[in-house]
From Swiss-Prot:
Specifically required in males for proper segregation of autosomal bivalents at meiosis I. Expression is required in the male germ line prior to spermatocyte stage S4. May have a role as a bridging molecule maintaining adhesion to hold autosome bivalents together via heterochromatic connections. The gene is tef. Residues 148-161 have a biased composition (Basic and acidic residues). Its main location: nucleus. GO terms for biological process: male meiosis chromosome separation. Drosophilid specific gene duplication generates rgr and tef. Teflon has a function unique to Drosophilids. The lineage of its organism: Eukaryota, Metazoa, Ecdysozoa, Arthropoda, Hexapoda. It comes from Drosophila pseudoobscura pseudoobscura (Fruit fly). A zinc finger (C2H2-type) spans 32-55, 649-672, 677-700. This is Protein teflon. InterPro entries: Znf_C2H2_sf, Znf_C2H2_type. It is found in: Nucleus; Chromosome. GO terms for molecular function: zinc ion binding. It comes from the Eukaryota. Belongs to the Teflon family.
Length: 703
């Protein structure tokens, strides 16, 4: 090959066009087109052999040329690329050494590359090719660029095969995942912010519902009469009549409040609410009818013209006050209640159906809401023996006529005199109240009367109707005695009620069952199952004896795992073998503890132990309760019992077993308990009459 290069440099080489390269992008193929025979070859070695064998006369080959495959020439280069890719994959990918490693690789035609391929070296040795000379030429070409020959300047050089793209490294994949998650978080934040803006916009532009507007209009209509304004013409005469001449100037004065006595307690309350009026200096807002304005809740300015303060009230003097000296505020309450129409009184009964309103401050003249006493007034002295209410007590509520102030004052005076009576009169009144079952069981004292008086400032009831509730009526007493006599006579003659035969219930009373359980538990030393603090009531020697007995019983119980393990009990499968185990366990317990217990009593003890142990496990591990020292000691004796898995409950009347306490109790209640209703034909018991009658109709076909 060195001689060929020398000839090429001397210019003695004849360049002959042998063929063209044909490319088919559709089929993804490259072929060589022979210029002499017009034939196409898909492989380069095949094309070279064709030229040597078929067109040697034209090309004038002096001897046979050796032709190598491209795969053989490129095998070493591909192996080096694989080694380089492995080195790059082992590195972090961010060190920046890939370019240096590519520059450090030798050229495919160098001596270092050819020396690794044995076949190429043998072929070169057959033709006496100098490898070192080739290496020097390659180095000279790498360091100094040879000027192109004028004869070969128009030809293109062979291209080096391009490198395959490297797969992404681990760091590249991690960075890609991080950026993808960050983009997702940003998208979620934008979506949430848009939803938040939409919610805030809907809250700002929310229109008040028609139901709320209706409630607000009702509230405004109810309060329109209470807001300050000119008083009604119908109530003014009654106010002027009831008020005395000396007290009117004190009420009409707006700036000079009355002098209060510092030694006596006093109560201050407003008689008139602050008047809410539009400001005169403010101009009215003009609105266009064609534009629909949305209602906006704003606070209007309050213009308070005057505030009147009531004079102080002396409780001792008011209790003994005569009818002529009734204070002005009491006459206002009486007149306002008397002037109410029946329609207005009936509206208070519907107050329960209305939605709750905002509580407002009470005033001495305004009626804001109905009192709970008023709602209970129609239910006064409700009893089965009473048929009609007395006309005296219900006349005030039913009649709409205005009562004269003199009669009202007289009735109020009588009620106050009765409350301040002597002890003998109070005892007689108390005995009279006890005889009447329908009346109240207490008498009103002066403090209670004053409290009721202050609490009824805003209600639509007067004080007299409340005081009459505590007084027994003679007519009611006679009516009650007559009805009681009729009931006694009816019971003596015999009522048409259904009489059912009373059967003795097989289940023992609770006290007897508890005594029986205590006796059984005392025998085996397990009183802690019923009383967790029983050791505190006993001396030390006796408590130690109980602990020793319980330890013996638990040791024997531990050996019979087929009794306390539900899984092993089910594997036995035959009730006879389980009965044999219980009998042997009973005999061993009687022999070790020196007692005389039956098999049913042993079953009862085991059921009590399982129920108590399950309850203590629930308290300790699930409810995190602190157990006493004695309870923990006895729990340790039965540590082998299952804590979560099902345990064994034995029926004391039959041979059935159950995995939990609920099924055991249901079985006893439905099968072995004798109830009040028992079928005479089949002997089945029923807890309720409905099921007994249904059983008779469906099973025995009885009407």
């Amino acid at each position: 090959m060195s001689s060929f290069l020398d000839i090429l440099g001397d210019g003695h080489v004849n360049f002959e066009k042998c063929g063209d390269v044909v490319v088919s992008p559709k089929d993804n193929m490259v072929a060589m087109f022979c210029h002499f025979c017009k034939d196409i070859f898909t492989h380069l070695p095949e094309f070279m052999r064709h030229l040597q064998w078929s067109h040697s006369d034209v090309l004038q080959f002096t001897k046979e040329q050796n032709v190598y495959r491209v795969e053989e020439l490129m095998s070493l280069e591909t192996s080096e690329d694989d080694v380089q890719s492995q080195a790059n994959s082992c590195s972090s990918g961010d060190s920046g050494l890939a370019g240096e490693m590519e520059d450090a690789d030798g050229e495919p035609g160098s001596s270092e590359c050819l020396a690794n391929n044995l076949e190429i070296m043998n072929a070169l040795a057959a033709f006496d090719v100098d490898v070192d000379g080739l290496n020097n030429v390659s180095h000279e070409q790498s360091y100094s660029k040879t000027p192109p020959d004028s004869r070969t300047e128009g030809f293109r050089c062979a291209r080096k095969p391009g490198r395959v793209e490297k797969p992404p490294s681990i760091c590249d994949l991690k960075s890609y995942n991080i950026t993808r998650h960050s983009r997702k978080r940003e998208a979620i934040k934008q979506r949430l912010s848009s939803v938040k803006k939409r919610i805030m916009r809907s809250l700002e532009n929310d229109v008040i519902s028609p139901r709320l507007n209706k409630l607000r209009s009702k509230l405004n209509n109810s309060l329109s009469s209470n807001i300050s304004g000119p008083p009604k013409q119908s109530k003014m005469p009654s106010l002027l009549e009831n008020s005395s001449v000396n007290e009117l100037p004190a009420v009409l004065e707006s700036t000079n409040p009355p002098n209060f006595d510092s030694e006596q307690p006093y109560v201050v309350s407003t008689t008139i609410k602050p008047s809410i009026r539009p400001c005169p200096s403010r101009t009215a807002v003009k609105t266009d009818r064609n534009i629909s304005h949305q209602p906006v809740a704003r606070r209007s300015t309050v213009n308070i013209e005057r505030v009147d303060i009531l004079p102080p009230i002396n409780i001792k003097q008011k209790m003994k006050m005569s009818a002529k000296d009734i204070p002005f505020w009491e006459s206002i309450i009486i007149s306002s209640v008397a002037s109410q129409q029946p329609s207005e009184l009936n509206t208070t009964n519907n107050a329960v159906d209305q939605p709750p309103k905002r509580p407002e401050r009470r005033s001495s003249l305004t009626v804001i809401s109905s009192s709970p006493i008023q709602a209970m007034k129609p239910m006064r002295r409700s009893s089965m023996t009473r048929e009609n209410t007395s006309p005296e007590s219900s006349g005030i509520l039913r009649s709409g006529e205005v009562e004269s102030p003199a009669k009202a004052n007289k009735r109020t005076k009588d009620s106050f005199e009765e409350t301040s009576s002597s002890n003998e009169k109070g005892n007689a009144k108390r005995s009279k109240l006890e005889q009447n079952r329908c009346s109240m069981n207490f008498s009103l004292s002066a403090s209670v009367t004053e409290y009721i008086r202050s609490d009824l400032k805003t209600s639509k009831l007067d004080l007299d109707s409340i005081l009459r509730l505590a007084e027994p009526l003679e007519s009611d007493y006679f009516k009650n005695t007559i009805v009681e006599d009729q009931v006694k006579n009816a019971t003596k003659m015999g009522s048409p009620q259904k009489e059912f035969t009373k059967l003795q219930i097989g289940v023992k009373p609770e006290m007897e069952a508890l005594k029986e359980d205590l006796r059984l538990l005392k025998t085996v030393g397990l009183l802690v199952l019923k009383d967790s603090c029983f050791e505190d009531k006993l001396p030390f020697e006796q408590s130690e004896s109980f602990r020793k007995t319980a330890a013996k019983f638990s040791k024997i119980y531990h050996t019979y795992d087929t009794i306390w393990s539900y899984r092993k009990t089910k594997t036995i499968g035959v009730h006879q073998r389980l009965t044999e185990q219980l009998n042997s366990f009973t005999e061993e317990v009687n022999r070790e503890i020196d007692c005389h217990l039956t098999t049913n009593e042993i079953k009862r003890i085991l059921n009590l132990i399982n129920s108590w142990y399950a309850y203590q496990i629930d308290q300790r591990f699930f409810r995190k309760a602190t157990l006493s020292y004695s309870v923990e000691h006895y729990m340790f004796l039965f540590h082998f019992l299952p804590k979560i898995n099902p345990t064994v409950y034995f029926c004391e009347c039959c041979e059935e077993i159950f995995p939990n306490e609920a099924r055991y109790k249901k079985h006893v209640q439905s099968v072995h308990a004798v109830h009040a209703f028992t079928c005479s034909e089949c002997g089945k018991s029923f807890k309720r009459l409905y099921f007994y009658e249904k059983h008779l109709k469906t099973v025995h076909l009885k009407p």
